[in-house]
Amino acid sequence: LQFLMTRGLRIPPHAKAHAETVVHTFERDVILYSLMPHAHLRGKAAKFTAAFPDGREETLLSVPRYDFNWQTVYVLNEPRPLPAGTQVKFEMVWDNSAQNPANPDPSRAVPWGDQTWDEMNAGWI
Protein backbone atom coordinates (compact mmCIF):
# COMPACT_ATOMS: atom_id res chain seq x y z
CA LEU A 1 0.00 0.00 0.00
CA GLN A 2 1.35 3.40 -0.98
CA PHE A 3 -0.25 6.62 0.27
CA LEU A 4 0.13 9.77 -1.86
CA MET A 5 -0.82 13.15 -0.37
CA THR A 6 -0.16 16.89 -0.21
CA ARG A 7 -0.14 18.03 3.43
CA GLY A 8 0.62 21.68 2.59
CA LEU A 9 -2.58 21.95 0.56
CA ARG A 10 -4.16 25.42 0.37
CA ILE A 11 -7.00 26.03 -2.09
CA PRO A 12 -7.53 29.74 -2.86
CA PRO A 13 -10.95 31.34 -2.30
CA HIS A 14 -13.31 31.11 -5.28
CA ALA A 15 -10.92 28.84 -7.26
CA LYS A 16 -13.03 26.87 -9.75
CA ALA A 17 -10.36 24.33 -10.77
CA HIS A 18 -7.41 24.28 -8.36
CA ALA A 19 -5.15 21.29 -9.11
CA GLU A 20 -2.34 19.60 -7.18
CA THR A 21 -0.20 16.66 -8.29
CA VAL A 22 1.70 14.19 -6.12
CA VAL A 23 4.33 11.87 -7.65
CA HIS A 24 5.72 8.62 -6.27
CA THR A 25 8.58 6.70 -7.92
CA PHE A 26 8.73 2.97 -7.28
CA GLU A 27 12.26 1.77 -6.51
CA ARG A 28 11.42 -1.86 -7.26
CA ASP A 29 8.99 -3.83 -9.43
CA VAL A 30 5.45 -3.80 -8.00
CA ILE A 31 2.02 -5.10 -8.96
CA LEU A 32 -0.86 -2.64 -8.85
CA TYR A 33 -4.24 -4.05 -7.79
CA SER A 34 -6.36 -1.03 -6.90
CA LEU A 35 -6.51 2.75 -6.57
CA MET A 36 -8.52 5.10 -4.39
CA PRO A 37 -8.71 8.89 -4.66
CA HIS A 38 -9.96 10.86 -1.66
CA ALA A 39 -11.02 14.48 -1.19
CA HIS A 40 -13.82 16.24 0.66
CA LEU A 41 -16.73 18.46 -0.46
CA ARG A 42 -14.75 20.51 -2.98
CA GLY A 43 -13.26 17.50 -4.80
CA LYS A 44 -14.02 17.80 -8.52
CA ALA A 45 -11.84 15.30 -10.42
CA ALA A 46 -9.07 12.78 -9.81
CA LYS A 47 -6.58 11.02 -12.05
CA PHE A 48 -3.78 8.47 -11.60
CA THR A 49 -1.18 8.22 -14.39
CA ALA A 50 1.83 5.91 -14.73
CA ALA A 51 4.99 7.29 -16.34
CA PHE A 52 7.16 4.31 -17.26
CA PRO A 53 10.97 4.31 -17.39
CA ASP A 54 10.85 3.96 -21.21
CA GLY A 55 8.92 7.26 -21.53
CA ARG A 56 5.43 5.84 -22.11
CA GLU A 57 2.51 7.17 -20.06
CA GLU A 58 -0.73 5.39 -19.24
CA THR A 59 -3.85 6.58 -17.45
CA LEU A 60 -4.52 4.11 -14.65
CA LEU A 61 -7.73 5.73 -13.38
CA SER A 62 -9.69 8.83 -14.33
CA VAL A 63 -12.58 10.07 -12.20
CA PRO A 64 -13.78 13.15 -14.12
CA ARG A 65 -16.68 13.86 -11.72
CA TYR A 66 -15.47 13.07 -8.21
CA ASP A 67 -18.25 12.88 -5.60
CA PHE A 68 -17.46 12.90 -1.87
CA ASN A 69 -20.55 10.76 -1.22
CA TRP A 70 -19.33 8.01 -3.54
CA GLN A 71 -15.96 6.99 -2.17
CA THR A 72 -14.77 3.66 -3.42
CA VAL A 73 -11.70 1.58 -4.05
CA TYR A 74 -11.31 1.02 -7.79
CA VAL A 75 -10.08 -2.55 -8.29
CA LEU A 76 -8.38 -3.21 -11.63
CA ASN A 77 -9.82 -5.97 -13.83
CA GLU A 78 -6.30 -7.39 -14.14
CA PRO A 79 -3.35 -6.71 -11.83
CA ARG A 80 -0.96 -4.23 -13.49
CA PRO A 81 2.79 -4.84 -13.19
CA LEU A 82 4.79 -1.63 -12.80
CA PRO A 83 8.56 -1.91 -13.30
CA ALA A 84 11.08 -0.25 -11.01
CA GLY A 85 11.46 3.41 -11.91
CA THR A 86 7.78 3.88 -12.77
CA GLN A 87 6.34 7.14 -11.50
CA VAL A 88 2.69 7.21 -10.46
CA LYS A 89 1.21 10.70 -10.65
CA PHE A 90 -1.93 11.46 -8.67
CA GLU A 91 -3.75 14.65 -9.64
CA MET A 92 -6.74 16.02 -7.74
CA VAL A 93 -8.81 19.03 -8.83
CA TRP A 94 -11.07 21.00 -6.46
CA ASP A 95 -13.91 23.45 -7.06
CA ASN A 96 -13.94 26.11 -4.34
CA SER A 97 -16.37 28.33 -6.26
CA ALA A 98 -19.96 29.31 -5.53
CA GLN A 99 -20.98 27.10 -8.50
CA ASN A 100 -20.15 24.02 -6.40
CA PRO A 101 -23.41 23.29 -4.53
CA ALA A 102 -21.56 21.18 -1.92
CA ASN A 103 -19.12 23.98 -1.05
CA PRO A 104 -19.77 25.26 2.50
CA ASP A 105 -17.84 28.55 2.02
CA PRO A 106 -16.32 29.61 -1.34
CA SER A 107 -14.80 32.76 0.23
CA ARG A 108 -12.49 30.68 2.43
CA ALA A 109 -8.92 29.63 1.62
CA VAL A 110 -9.14 25.90 2.32
CA PRO A 111 -6.27 24.06 4.05
CA TRP A 112 -5.51 20.36 4.45
CA GLY A 113 -7.59 18.94 7.30
CA ASP A 114 -9.37 15.88 8.59
CA GLN A 115 -12.71 17.67 8.90
CA THR A 116 -15.11 17.62 5.96
CA TRP A 117 -15.11 21.44 5.68
CA ASP A 118 -11.34 21.30 5.10
CA GLU A 119 -9.80 19.34 2.21
CA MET A 120 -7.55 16.44 1.43
CA ASN A 121 -5.44 15.36 -1.49
CA ALA A 122 -5.09 11.67 -0.73
CA GLY A 123 -4.58 8.75 -3.05
CA TRP A 124 -4.01 5.10 -2.17
CA ILE A 125 -2.46 2.62 -4.56
What is each stretch, according to the model?
Residues 1-125:
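His-enriched metal-coordination microenvironments in redox/metal-binding proteins
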